[in-house]
Design a protein with these regions (language model features):
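Catalytic phosphate/metal-binding cores of nucleic-acid and nucleotide-processing enzymes, i.e., regions
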Residues: 2-3
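Histidine-centered catalytic micro-motifs
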Residues: 6-17, 40-45, 158-162
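Enrichment for repetitive, rod-forming helical segments
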Residues: 17-19, 167
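Short amphipathic alpha-helical segment that frequently serves as the phosphate-/nucleotide-binding helix
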Residues: 20-24
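Catalytic domains of carbohydrate-active enzymes, especially glycoside hydrolases
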Residues: 26-41
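Short beta-strand segments at enzyme active-site cores
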Residues: 38-43, 76-80
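Extended substrate/RNA-proximal surfaces in nucleic-acid metabolism proteins
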Residues: 48-180
Length: 180
């Protein structure tokens, strides 16, 4: 019996700087293959810009609400793939202050890049792209890193945990995710 996929929530557009499709091309691809749900999760990461603390570098996330929710018969979810940036499970942008909006006007109060970018998204994928953040870490520490990264309510899943090469207690992380 073949395994049929009905959704893909870890896709990228050209905004991730290593993908070559637009959101429209991804939606049409998903519709042609019978997917019911497509999640676009471009990188919320320093790897997409030379100015990682500038909100203007991430305004494509803020503008995703113009996408149709149902597009060519496919439910389109608005997401991001946020880097896990430290062994404590912190996500990119959580500690990055932003004082100017995309037009260069000052905010009346300080915001974090993470909050501004993710506040209207449907979900996040949390991923390690730089395994050096856990260099010399114990199995317990890397396990706790992944568990902590799952704690923000926007985080729906972890991304490509095997690719990072970081060992962790899979069962502990899965049990934590299930309890969320």
């Amino acid at each position: 019996m073949p395994y049929l996929l009905s959704c893909d929530i870890h896709t990228h557009t050209m905004f991730s700087a290593h993908a070559y499709s637009t959101i429209e091309e991804n939606v049409y691809w998903a519709a042609e293959r019978g997917l019911q749900v497509l999640g676009s999760a471009d990188h919320l990461s320093s790897m997409v810009t030379a100015c990682p603390n500038d909100l203007r570098s991430y305004q494509f996330f803020i503008n995703q609400d113009i996408w149709p929710r149902i597009w060519s018969g496919v439910l389109v979810l608005r997401g991001a793939e946020a880097d896990i940036v430290s062994l404590d499970g912190s996500l990119f942008g959580e500690d990055t202050p932003v004082t100017l909006d995309i037009a260069g006007d000052s905010y009346s109060r300080q915001h974090s890049l993470f909050d501004l970018v993710t506040r209207n998204l449907d979900y996040l994928v949390a991923s390690v792209h730089n395994p050096q953040i856990a260099e010399g870490a114990t199995l317990a520490q890397t396990t706790e890193m992944y568990i902590t990264a799952l704690d923000p309510p926007q985080v729906f899943t972890l991304g490509h945990t095997g690719r990072s090469g970081l060992p962790f207690q899979t069962d502990e992380v899965l049990l934590h995710a299930k309890a969320q």
